[in-house]
Design a protein with these regions (language model features):
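Mature, Sec-exported extracytoplasmic domains of Gram-positive
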Residues: 21-215
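C-terminal motif of bacterial Sec signal peptides marking the signal peptidase cleavage site
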Residues: 15-19
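Sec-dependent signal peptide recognition
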Residues: 2-10
Length: 215
């Protein structure tokens, strides 16, 4: 009888340990991210190297002005672009926001992205990279990432698109390394036929070729 009781006690302990081990395995890889937006930016810059593309830090006025974010809802932020933005559309905006503001922030970044895309389509400048933009929402972290090395502008659209996709995949890999998953929420609007999305009117009222901003 004692041997039977001892056997069942031992079996119970083994099952308990196995259950605990299973819970530990379930939690493995689910480390909570506590990085600031700047720390995430620094990680992207380090891991991507030449595929990062940004060399200028943006100001808070840019975050609240151009992107329209409510800074009262932002816990930390980081934003960078390329100093030659007329021909290099590399851009990275990362924010850690307060609870409940992530989707609003994502919508604002989407709106700003559409203006960048409109410019890129109008001049056919760095277009394939812009079309490979990433909009990530992971908990309270939101990011718009237009990153990648410059491709060969003289190459065919197909070759440029393939190169841009490969560069964007590098961004996915780094983001996945931080958050464990990637889910690109960017929306690519269709071209409206005007070639400029209403962002610029390239002729003045008299039909001259002098560019006029704002219509």
């Amino acid at each position: 009888m004692k041997r039977i009781l001892t056997f069942f006690l031992a079996l119970t302990m083994v099952l308990s340990l196995a259950a605990c081990g299973g819970k530990a395995d379930d939690n493995k890889g689910k480390t909570e991210v506590t990085m600031t937006a700047q720390e995430i930016m620094d990680t992207l810059k380090e891991k991507l190297g030449d595929s990062f593309g940004c060399d200028v830090a943006e100001t808070e006025d840019n975050i609240s002005g151009y992107w329209g974010l409510d800074m009262g809802q932002v816990e930390s932020w980081a934003s960078m672009s390329n100093s030659n933005s007329a021909v290099n559309s590399s851009y990275a905006v990362i924010v850690k926001v307060k609870e409940g503001y992530a989707q609003d922030a994502a919508a604002l970044l989407q709106t700003g992205y559409e203006q960048i895309l409109s410019y890129s389509r109008m001049y056919n400048m760095d277009l394939q990279k812009v079309l490979q933009a990433r909009l990530f929402v992971n908990g309270n972290y939101v990011a718009l990432l237009i990153l990648g090395a410059q491709g060969d502008w003289e190459a065919s659209d197909e070759v440029q698109a393939k190169f841009a996709a490969e560069e964007a995949a590098k961004v996915d890999d780094v983001w996945r390394g931080i958050f464990g998953s990637v889910d690109n929420g960017i929306t690519i609007p269709e071209e409206d036929g005007s070639n400029n999305g209403g962002f610029f009117d390239m002729t003045d009222d008299e039909g001259n070729n002098d560019p006029v901003l704002g219509g």
